[in-house]
A protein has these predicted regions:
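Oxidative protein folding and maturation machinery
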Residues: 1-201
């Protein structure tokens, strides 16, 4: 696709392309809401439908480079974050919003000189993402949805089974939604039973 071919550009050039595309979408969106009697929620959803996918493009660009690259310390690159809401409960089940927040968590969880592709299957990285949720996300509903998503990624990684208990201990410390927590515990137990030589659940 057009944007996929632009990830090799500098941060400044990539930003300019995304900003230009977003401005075009914003202008069309303004025309749309001026011609229609949209509710405030409809306005929010229609704007979020292009705002957060473009923000996610910027976040993914940074993730590809990881903290081993200058992009992480380039505060100008991350200016787009200033216009985003990280605790919007009304968008808690809106996929583009959650996808962006998951990318944001991953960027924040990376250590110095660590790349996303080397870290993403690591239990310690998922524990750090849980810690970022606890420290950065204030809305309880959003916090639970994001933590559940991270927990699923961890538990479904069979290579990490030996470390799942360590992760679950960290997950339990953020006072998760009990239904979600029980769901994750049950999933982990079932997957553990599927290991070689053990009966299926």
């Amino acid at each position: 696709s057009f944007l996929s071919s632009k990830y090799s550009l500098s941060g400044k050039s990539f930003n300019q392309i995304i900003d230009s595309l977003q401005r075009e979408k914003y202008i069309n969106w303004k025309k749309l809401i001026e011609k229609n009697d949209f509710s405030n929620f409809s306005k929010k959803i229609t704007e979020a439908s292009f705002k957060y996918p473009y923000a996610n493009r910027k976040a993914r660009y940074a993730l590809i480079r990881g903290k081993s690259k200058n992009i992480k310390i380039d505060s100008a690159y991350f200016k787009y974050r200033d216009k985003l809401n990280y605790n919007d409960e009304e968008l808690s089940f809106f996929e583009p919003y959650i996808s962006y927040l998951m990318s944001y968590l991953s960027i924040e969880a990376l250590e110095k000189d660590e790349t996303f592709y080397s870290a993403k299957n690591n239990t310690n990285f998922n524990i750090k993402r849980i810690e970022v949720i606890e420290n950065k996300i204030k809305n309880t509903k959003l916090k639970n949805i994001l933590a559940r998503a991270v927990a699923y990624e961890e538990i479904m990684n069979f290579n990490n089974q030996i470390s799942h208990e360590k992760f679950l201990e960290s997950y339990s410390l953020i006072d998760p939604n009990q239904e979600y927590f029980n769901e994750i515990i049950g999933l982990n137990k079932s997957l553990m039973q599927m290991r070689a030589g053990r009966p299926l659940p």
